A protein has these predicted regions:
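Intrinsic-disorder/low-complexity recognition with aromatic hotspots
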Residues: 6-9
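Face-selective signature of the C-terminal outer-membrane beta-barrel domain
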Residues: 1, 14, 19-172
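Short glycine-enriched, charge-decorated loop/helix-capping segments at active-site entrances
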Residues: 174-177
Length: 177
């Protein structure tokens, strides 16, 4: 990289070599369902569990050579990023017929979500390193009730839903909490 002034005189210049010595990304998702049908026609009880996982690791390195009049005091850097995301979802649903064309559906759901990240940067040629670690938690609890009506080509649905969410983000070193 070269930045030129009027008259094509270089203000500064350097060569940059960039590469990624490490990169991994894994994502897993799964689901389990259990459904129980009762003796009553159309009535069922369902339990569900879902899992979502993501793991990512990235290393990015820059090295600078042939430095002339640069405004930075280092000769390169290594940036390391790590992310861990985990989400568990639990759900229960009950569907009960109330008569011909009428149904009641009641359910609840709980989500536990954790996201953690660590970032660091090492500078070459000077004694200066940076690092940040962040933890984020979200918990969601919800409940619902629906009335469902079906008649020939027509259907209608009315319901209520309540949802409560708790969120917290923190830096383990205590800064900016």
């Amino acid at each position: 990289s070269t930045w030129l002034e009027h008259g094509d005189q270089p203000v500064y210049s350097y060569n940059n070599h960039y590469w990624m010595p490490g990169y991994q990304h894994h994502s897993w998702n799964g689901r389990l369902d259990y459904e129980h049908k009762t003796r009553r026609k159309g009535e069922r009880f369902t339990l569900s569990y879902m899992l979502a996982l993501t793991r990512q690791h990235t290393d990015q390195e820059n090295t600078y050579t042939e430095l002339q009049n640069v405004s930075f005091p280092y000769t390169g850097s290594l940036m390391t990023e790590r992310e861990r995301f985990t989400e568990h979802t639990f759900q229960a649903d009950w569907l009960r017929p109330l008569g011909k064309g009428h149904q009641l559906e009641i359910g609840t759901k709980y989500i536990d979500r954790n996201n953690n990240s660590e970032n660091s940067q090492q500078f070459y040629g000077i004694d200066m390193n940076t690092s940040d670690e962040f933890h984020h938690v979200t918990r969601v609890l919800a409940g619902y009730a629906d009335y469902i009506y079906n008649h020939e080509k027509w259907s209608a649905r009315a319901g209520l839903r309540y949802e409560y969410s708790y969120m917290r983000g923190s830096y383990p070193d205590g800064k900016d909490e």
